[in-house]
Structure formats: C-alpha cells, structure tokens
C-alpha cells in the first residue's frame, strides 16, 4: 500500500509533553467500526464500561532502562569525538545493538567511553568497542562489562530515551523516570515505554478486578526502532526492526481458556498485540513463544486472536498508525484521528488513549 495513505496533518500543540494527572484522568476515544455510533468521547477511568466479566486484559510488563548513552569515541591517530548511542536490543550479556549519532563517522574497532566527567559511575567509565556497523546508524557495541554489572553501569550513566518529538521540545528530567514507566513494569530491557499502559492506576486495576476481568502479562522489549519514520513510499518496501519478547506457557493456556469460554482478549498497547499475533497459530490458539519478532501489520492482515486494542494516538505515516488502521479500518481511523485533532485530544507517548474494536 502507498505510505501516503497513512499521512495526516497534526498541529504541534496536540503533542503532549507531560502525562495527565492522575494517569486515569486522560481522555479515551472509543472507536467501534461495527456500531451505529462509531466514536464516543470518554475517560480512561471509564474503561470498565466497555469490558465484561470473563474478558482478559493483556499488558506488556517490560521495564524501560535508561538506554540513552553519551560518550567519547576514541580512535588511534584521531581526536576524540562526542557520540550519542541509543541502545535498542540486547544481543548478548555484553553486547547491545544501538543507533548512534553521528553514525557515518563511526568505524568498526572504534572504542567509545560512556560515562565520563560527572557521569562516571561507581564502576568507573563504561567502555565499549564497535563490533559491527549496519544501515541507518545502527551499530553493535561490545562492552567491557557483562550481565548484571553492565546493567548496573547503564542504569548509573544512562538517560531515559524520550521520544524524539518530546526530546525536541524539552530535556529529560527526573520526573520522566517515573512518568515514562508503567506501574506494573518488571522485566528490564525496553528503551521505549509501552505507552498505552501508562494510563493505568491501582484504582483502575481494583475496579477491573472487582468486575471479574482477568489480568495477564507478556513481555516485549520495545526498541528504539518504534520511533523510526517510514521512509519507503510503499509498505512492501519498509524494513521492520526486530524486538525480543516472550509469552510463557501458563499465560498462553489461560488466554486460550478465556477464548474458549467466550471471553474477549483486550490488548493494552500495540506491543502486546504484536506479540500475541506473533505467538498465535492460524486457528487463533496462542502458543508459548520466545524470540525476536518483526511482525509488520498493515490493512489486509487477518487478526487471529485479539478482539479489542487500547492504544495511544500515533505519528502520521508510522507503522503503528498502519496497525490501528488494519485493526479498525483505514477510513474509520482517519475519521477518528480527525475527530481527535478537532476536539483537543493529546497525542503520542504522554497523550490520551483510544479503545478500538476490531472491524468485523
């Protein structure tokens, strides 16, 4: 499909720079392409009105790490150069794939010293060697540290990698360490938050528990590739970056039981949906799954297992807007986004949410 079909104009003032407080006071646009009244304006705390006892909500419990690293590149016979690296996928206990700037000037064999000056951690400077170099500024870093020691050093010297559309307007600060994390995050490894989950509060969880809605957790470590623009003119030519995740056997069994007795699967976030669709067989059965997924969902895709999707408002021409258009219909989502822009919904990671019903 032509990528320009997924383009739209978004006024700059619609980009949220801070989350709503409290989290569940954010607005919720309910989109049901199968109903007479397709669009309904609500709040996140009204979510329970659209769920039934026996439904299951699936959350991504990945935890954001401070994956934005600043350092100095060292090369024999050349002056040191400032380098920025955003870690996006762990390749081994001592290796990370990263997007580097300025990427063109980095060579295989370069040594980069992260955490210098005031940012040196208790373990000393964090050193890495460029082991591989790919396209678009992607590199593979082999660190001198490994495993938990490397994790500790990254946590000490790294910064929260705010989405570019927020970082362009203000610097990351201490509030973001809490704001850019879900209340249920537990599996460290993401470099971007599964942002639909940012809306949930203990109070909302209690409401859902009381009405008999099940809660289940899967893990997909969101990579920095989620922020990359689609540069191709046709979706067939776009290359997705891979992300690591898993669905354990117990969760798969429980979700299959929900479907068998007539309950619905409600995914919180596109990451949860992409992971479940990666783990689902053609008949909709969810299998235990572990590995890297590069699933790219566009209109025409046949969804196997997910019935409803809660998600934030996405970038024009993004793979995520393509996904929601596949789920609820392109014309429906274009109309929904036009309504959201005209009525003041807040967009992107810290913005408002939507609840999408899958198009019949």
UniProtKB/Swiss-Prot annotation:
Please give the GO cellular component terms listed in this UniProt entry.
cytoplasm
Query: Which BP terms does GO give this entry?
Result: queuosine biosynthetic process; tRNA wobble guanine modification
Enzyme Commission number, as recorded: 2.4.99.17
In which broad location class does this protein mainly occur, judging by the first location in its UniProt entry?
cytoplasm
What pathway does the annotation place this protein in? tRNA modification; tRNA-queuosine biosynthesis
- The answer on whether this UniProt entry bears the keyword Cytoplasm reads yes
* InterPro entries, alphabetized: QueA (IPR003699), QueA_dom1 (IPR042118), QueA_dom2 (IPR042119), QueA_sf (IPR036100)
Question: Pfam family example for this protein?
Answer: Queuosine_synth
Q: Which GO terms describe its molecular function?
A: S-adenosylmethionine:tRNA ribosyltransferase-isomerase activity
Q: Which family does it belong to?
A: Belongs to the QueA family.
Entry's PANTHER family? Answer: S-ADENOSYLMETHIONINE:TRNA RIBOSYLTRANSFERASE-ISOMERASE
Biological function: Transfers and isomerizes the ribose moiety from AdoMet to the 7-aminomethyl group of 7-deazaguanine (preQ1-tRNA) to give epoxyqueuosine (oQ-tRNA).
Q: What is this protein called?
A: S-adenosylmethionine:tRNA ribosyltransferase-isomerase
Query: Which species is this record about?
Result: Rhizobium rhizogenes (strain K84 / ATCC BAA-868) (Agrobacterium radiobacter)
Question: Could you read off the lineage of the organism from its UniProt record?
Answer: Bacteria, Pseudomonadati, Pseudomonadota, Alphaproteobacteria, Hyphomicrobiales
């Amino acid at each position: 499909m032509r990528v320009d079909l997924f383009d739209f104009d978004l006024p700059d003032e619609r980009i949220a720079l801070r989350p709503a407080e409290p989290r569940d006071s954010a607005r919720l646009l309910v989109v049901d392409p199968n109903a007479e009244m397709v669009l309904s304006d609500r709040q996140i705390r009204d979510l329970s009105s659209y769920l039934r006892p026996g439904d299951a909500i699936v959350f991504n419990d990945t935890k954001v790490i401070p994956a934005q690293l600043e350092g100095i590149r060292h090369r024999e016979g050349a002056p040191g150069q400032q380098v920025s690296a955003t870690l996006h996928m762990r390749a081994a206990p001592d290796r990370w794939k990263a997007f580097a700037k300025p990427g063109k000037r980095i060579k295989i064999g370069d040594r980069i010293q992260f955490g210098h000056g005031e940012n040196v951690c208790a373990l000393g400077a964090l050193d890495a060697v460029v082991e591989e170099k790919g396209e678009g500024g992607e590199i593979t870093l082999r660190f001198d540290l490994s495993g938990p020691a490397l994790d500790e050093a990254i946590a000490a010297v790294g910064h929260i990698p705010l989405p570019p559309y927020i970082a362009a307007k203000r610097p990351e600060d201490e509030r973001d360490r809490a704001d850019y994390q879900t209340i249920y995050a537990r599996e460290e490894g993401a470099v971007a938050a599964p942002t639909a989950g940012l809306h949930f509060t203990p109070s909302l969880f209690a409401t859902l528990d009381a009405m008999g809605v099940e809660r289940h957790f899967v893990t997909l470590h969101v990579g920095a590739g989620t922020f990359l623009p689609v540069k191709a003119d046709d979706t067939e030519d776009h290359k997705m970056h891979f992300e690591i995740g898993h669905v354990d056997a117990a969760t798969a069994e429980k979700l299959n039981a929900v479907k068998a007795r007539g309950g619905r699967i409600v995914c919180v976030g596109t990451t949860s949906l992409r992971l479940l669709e990666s783990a689902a067989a053609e008949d909709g059965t969810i299998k235990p799954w572990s590995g890297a997924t590069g699933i790219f969902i566009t209109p025409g895709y046949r969804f196997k297992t997910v019935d409803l999707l809660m998600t934030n408002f996405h970038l024009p021409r993004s793979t995520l807007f393509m996904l929601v258009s596949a789920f609820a219909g392109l014309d429906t989502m274009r109309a929904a986004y036009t309504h959201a822009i005209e009525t003041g919904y807040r967009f992107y990671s810290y913005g408002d949410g939507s609840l999408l019903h899958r198009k019949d």
